[in-house]
Amino acid sequence: MKDYAREENGGLVVMASCSDERFPPENMLDGKDNTFWVTTGMFPQEFVLRLESCIRVSKITTLSLNVRKLAVEKCDQDKPDQFEKVFEVELANRGDRLQTEVHQVNIRAKYLKFILLQGHGEFATVNRVSVVGGDDDGGGYDEPGGGYGSMQRQPSMGYGGGGGSAATGFAADPGNAAAGGGGGFEDEF
């Protein structure tokens, strides 16, 4: 299935609460595990992802480091001014290993807001975001009256080995800094 968060598929970060020119929010959408957006040391932090059009979303995946609590909200309108919660989750502390969160959802969205509510450390990173789904067919998702749609969480997985960490390894080898030894998420994203 198509990953609608990728830049080449129309995904665009239209707002980020913080930015470092060395680690811009666009890094989350480039398809690479060793590039990332980094927070500036305070929480909460958030970013809004605009999809090319309003689509049915079936899976949201994040690859991050040092995120303790994450919430995702959706908006299916042309103007991103009213969001509804999709899910909120607490992530395990994986040390210098990346956190992979996979959530099966059944929603319709044009915008997704990712809110990093708390971190395990002073800084946190989001290395990749994936939004999988299909064209908006006008129905069959978003439970009536629920606002949340439906969601099923798959267990969080850590990944990493020797090497640096994205939150502490800014001067490390860029090919090794984020994933503690490389990628390996091609099947997931």
Curated annotation (Swiss-Prot):
> Taxonomy-wise, where does this protein's organism fall, top ranks first?
Eukaryota, Viridiplantae, Chlorophyta, core chlorophytes, Chlorophyceae
* Compositionally skewed regions (Gly residues) per UniProt: 178-189
**PTM annotation:** Phosphorylated.
Into which family does the record put it?
Answer: Belongs to the IFT25 family.
Asked if the record carries the keyword Calcium, the reply is yes
Chain spans, region Disordered = 135-189
Q: Which GO terms describe its molecular function?
A: metal ion binding
Keywords recorded for this protein, A-Z:
Calcium, Cell projection, Cilium, Cytoplasm, Cytoskeleton, Flagellum, Metal-binding
Compositional bias of kind Low complexity? 167-177
Q: Mind listing the GO biological process terms from this record?
A: intraciliary transport
Effect of changing residue 125 to E: reported as: Abolishes interaction with IFT27
Query: Tell me, how does this one assemble?
Result: Component of the IFT complex B, the core composed of IFT25, IFT27, IFT46, IFT52, IFT74, IFT81 and IFT88 as well as associated subunits IFT20, IFT57, IFT80 and IFT172. Interacts with IFT27; the interaction is direct.
- Function in brief: Component of the intraflagellar transport (IFT) complex B. Forms a subcomplex within the IFT complex B with IFT27.
Primary subcellular site in the record, as a coarse category: other
Q: Where in the cell is it found?
A: Cell projection, Cilium, Flagellum; Cytoplasm, Cytoskeleton, Flagellum basal body
Does the record bear Cytoplasm in its keywords? yes
Its name, as the record gives it, is Intraflagellar transport protein 25
Which InterPro entries does the UniProt entry name for this protein?
A: Galactose-bd-like_sf, IFT25
Domain of life of the source:
Eukaryota
Please provide, in alphabetical order, the Gene Ontology terms of the cellular component aspect for this entry: cytoplasm; cytoskeleton; intraciliary transport particle B; motile cilium
Source species: Chlamydomonas reinhardtii (Chlamydomonas smithii)
